[in-house]
Amino acid sequence: EKKKIKEMKTALESRISRLVRQAEGMAPEEKEKYVHDFICSNVTYDKLKKQYSHEIIGPLQQGIGVCEGIAKTVKILCDRMGLECLIAISESAPDRGIRYRHAWNLVKLKNTWYHLDATFDNSLGRYGQKRFDYFNLDDRMIFKDHQPLVYKVPACTDGARFYYRENRLSLTKLEDVAGRFKAVLRKKQPYYVFHWRGGYLTREVLEQIAGIASEAAREKGKYVKISVNYSQSVMELAVTDYQSAQEICREEANEGELTGD
């Protein structure tokens, strides 16, 4: 038994070392994205919640994990790469259908803390794409759909490094949505994900965006299906060859379950 434990620890350490080596020479921001993308590409949420899924052995050796194991994995990788990283834990809320506490991370970049929830982003990514709805959020944004904290963590007050803002995927005008989506259709890309920052994402605004996207798609003989993360005002415009029964569907980042058809 002791020999088996020792072998397991050696294999785990070897895995961590290999991952850390691949990030050598990266800037802190690149390291954070590298860790996030590793989770989103290699870890599946364990709906059975096996014991090892709560520890780093789940994500790093079994390729599965729950939020606790994922947050611990993000932390150990960030620690080894020289990035300051903490784990945040929120309360459960049984009355709202949230049966368990939830864990995610805070990462420090240039003396400023940001929220990073790789579990939630992982629950949104489909057909090989990666989502960044929970990458470098400030307190105002993260607590739109995260429960109050079990214990205090540093304040996150900077919203300017939110992934979609920093990568010019945060749009404020309907004409910008039209222009970007037409470019996606021209390039025959399968989808376009963006953050809406042009005021409240009301039903009226959403219907206007749907109209713009549908018209642009029809011109190319295509259809569009829109998935909306209302909490973070992020939407995905997916190009399809067939008309969906439900053009607009709600998607909610959570513990590995995607809602909507």
Give the residues covered by each predicted segment.
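Hydrophobic/aromatic-rich core segments of domains that either
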Residues: G69-M141
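A short, highly charged nucleic-acid-interacting micro-segment common to nuclease
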Residues: I56-I70
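Short, charged, solvent-exposed linker or helix-capping segments at domain edges/interfaces
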Residues: I5-M8, D117, C249
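Low-complexity, Gly/Ser/Thr/Pro-rich intrinsically disordered linker/tail segments
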Residues: Q129-G260
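Secondary-structure boundary elements
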Residues: K4-P59
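Hydrophobic (often cysteine-bearing) scaffold residues that line and stabilize catalytic clefts
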Residues: L12, K31, V66, I70, ...
